[in-house]
């Protein structure tokens, strides 16, 4: 799967909006993930005690983790598909240490699309959403291949 230059432009254009508030976007995305798929919360010992959206919004640790997640994803997106070096340690930790199933990466991808659209409706129309979906699918496909190399059937 390959994205065109125009698609990468759309992806990176919206990502510039994310970078204006990485932690805030990340927190919103994680809250959306945990509310929509409560089972994902079980993978995070640090956040298991957060039961309500208000508790999640008040959590500095959740905000910090959102920043970490989106900083890593931004680094991958900026490589425009040439992300082998960035993907390898991420796949290693998510497969062997955290044991994060690929399905959960699909869930967070959906949360990313939803939050970007809700925060930036004018800049994140159908074409930009399609491009971001494609970029996130490429990321998931490549991380799934790394999982397989590591013997993780996530």
Curated annotation (Swiss-Prot):
The modification Phosphothreonine is found at residue 68. Nitrite binds at residue 65. It catalyses: Fe(III)-heme b-[protein] + nitric oxide + H2O = Fe(II)-heme b-[protein] + nitrite + 2 H(+); H2O2 + AH2 = A + 2 H2O. Keywords: Cytoplasm, Heme, Iron, Metal-binding, Muscle protein, Oxidoreductase, Oxygen transport, Phosphoprotein, Transport. Belongs to the globin family. The keyword Oxidoreductase applies. It comes from Balaenoptera acutorostrata. The lineage of its organism: Eukaryota, Metazoa, Chordata, Craniata, Vertebrata. Residues 2-148 form the Globin domain. The keyword Transport applies. CDD domains: Mb. This is Myoglobin. It is an enzyme of class 1 (oxidoreductase). It is found in: Cytoplasm, Sarcoplasm. O2 binds at residue 65. GO terms for molecular function: heme binding; metal ion binding; nitrite reductase activity; oxygen binding; oxygen carrier activity; peroxidase activity. Monomeric. Heme b binds at residue 94. The modification Phosphoserine is found at residue 4. It holds the Pfam family Globin. Monomeric heme protein which primary function is to store oxygen and facilitate its diffusion within muscle tissues. Reversibly binds oxygen through a pentacoordinated heme iron and enables its timely and efficient release as needed during periods of heightened demand. Depending on the oxidative conditions of tissues and cells, and in addition to its ability to bind oxygen, it also has a nitrite reductase activity whereby it regulates the production of bioactive nitric oxide.
